[in-house]
Amino acid sequence: MTKSTKILGLIGRAVDYSYSPLIHNTACRLLGLSYHYTVFNIADPSMIPDALRGAKALGIAGFNVTIPYKKSVVPFLDALSAEAASIQAVNTIVNEGGKLTGHNTDIAGFAAPLLPYRESIRGKTLSIFGAGGAALAAIEAFIRFFSPKEILLFVRNPEKASLLLEESGHDKSAPVRILCSDNPEIIRECRVIVNATPIGTRGNNDSPLPLDRELLHPGQIVYDMVYNPLDTPLLLAAQKAGAATISGIEMLIGQAEHSFTLWTGMQMPVKAVKESLLQEIQQ
């Protein structure tokens, strides 16, 4: 690092496990860019306003934002991109001369690994477990790119999820049905199953699966947003059942690629970065 090095970082809580520093620092090194990406753990949502004011004062170039702050940062930003405004959730912040603009690259990042399946997904019933910012991004991606018959949102608290959708400015004409996660029998008819919860994350003490493994079958695509471990309990169960699987690493790289371009104006060398990331994970 030098005096001219620009600082980037990840805003989250207890996210030292994140691979985002490796991804972005590798990309910057390969392209010869003078940036350094680090982690900013924020213990409580009440500290978010001070953190963002400090970022302006210190000239920090930008952030990624992860659980549980993707919605918490929104009121304290100066502007939102169309994508971020559409779901009132932010995963990327760009500091342009003291103006903080929130973006959401999760939408495009989530959609990217599903695009090869687009024709087989159109008009089908799709499902998501979870009701946070990541789930909202998945809903928006499904609607924008895949024209589903219906999106089933499995949650622990349907009333809270309904309020979250309403607050996000969600299009009420979209085919979203909220269901309690303790009764997912209908999952059998879903073409795509997405885990947008922390269930399965290394060190998470919840049940390792968001659904009964007996509901999985070869006609499904199972997409786990969790990326640590690489082979989550859900993905292993899905593979055993003969379903197609998508690792959270794909979304992690996809959203990171778009964030990187917003900050630097450059294209991320995705292939080389992904190779470096997988090598690190497998060690």
Curated annotation (Swiss-Prot):
Gene3D superfamilies: Leucine Dehydrogenase, chain A, domain 1 (3.40.50.10860), NAD(P)-binding Rossmann-like Domain (3.40.50.720). The keyword Cell division does not apply. Shikimate binds at residues 18-20, 66, 91, 106, 227. Its EC number is 1.1.1.25. InterPro entries: Aminoacid_DH-like_N_sf, NAD(P)-bd_dom_sf, SDH_C, Shikimate_DH, Shikimate_DH-bd_N, Shikimate_DH_fam. GO terms for cellular component: cytosol. NADP(+) binds at residues 130-134, 225, 248. Belongs to the shikimate dehydrogenase family. Coiled coil: none annotated. It comes from the Bacteria. It comes from Pelodictyon phaeoclathratiforme (strain DSM 5477 / BU-1). It catalyses: shikimate + NADP(+) = 3-dehydroshikimate + NADPH + H(+). This is Shikimate dehydrogenase (NADP(+)). Keywords: Amino-acid biosynthesis, Aromatic amino acid biosynthesis, NADP, Oxidoreductase. Pfam families: SDH_C, Shikimate_dh_N. The active site is at residue 70.
